[in-house]
Every structure is written in C-alpha cells, then in structure tokens.
Amino acid sequence: MDKELKALEEFCRRAGCTLTAQERLPNGGLILRVENVDIGPGWNRERATVLFLAPPGYPASKPDCFWIEPGNFRLANGATPQAANDGNPIPGDTVSGRNTTWFSWHVDPWQPGRDTLVKYFQIILSRLKPAR
C-alpha cells in the first residue's frame, strides 16, 4: 500500500492537487483526501476536495464511489449531478456529520495487482470532466 500511496501522491503533485490525508478507519479501510482538484468547467466551483475509500481488503476489494467536500456540489446551473446526492456517508467514517456530496460511481472490471489507487483517481477525474 505504501508504494501505491507514494504513486498517488506523485500523480496528484503533477496534476496540481495534493494528497493531504490518509485516515485509517476501524474497519480497516482508508479514506484518501485529495485537495485542490481541478474539476474543469460546468460546476458551481472551480476546484474541489475529493475523498475516496480504499476499502477493507484492498486491493482484492475494489474502490467504489467517491465524495466531494464540502457538500452541496452542483452543476453550474444549480442541478444535482447525475448519480449523486448529499447525505450518503462514507462507510465506516469516524467523522460525524461530514458535509459531502456522494457520487455513485463504479469501476468494472477491477483487477487486483494491476489496477491501482492512481487508476481509480483517474476514473474519478473522468467522471468530473465533463460536468454532468
């Protein structure tokens, strides 16, 4: 996992964002927090903080979904993004009442040993660009 976290940190640095936190959860999962993410045009803000979960059992268990902080993340016209809503918590999160917008976004197929946290973050970026 350390090698993957270093690779994600380097990818973020090159992309102009920052991997700022890795919060270990009691269930064995790990919340990853990436700040200052360029999300492209069409949103109600220019940059975002992205949170995603390396689930218990990762990499055999694939990442699933992601969150934008703070919540109330919307399209520029005020509409709720496709497959998103406010109020769905991060599974196992120890921060009560964390203010996020949840994106139901899934990766298929996932191949442990080949697919990485960098790949999943790239999938998140492809969901955010273009805005929809």
Task: Describe these PLM feature segments.
Residues 1-45, 57-132:
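UBC/E2-like fold recognition across ubiquitin and ubiquitin-like conjugation systems
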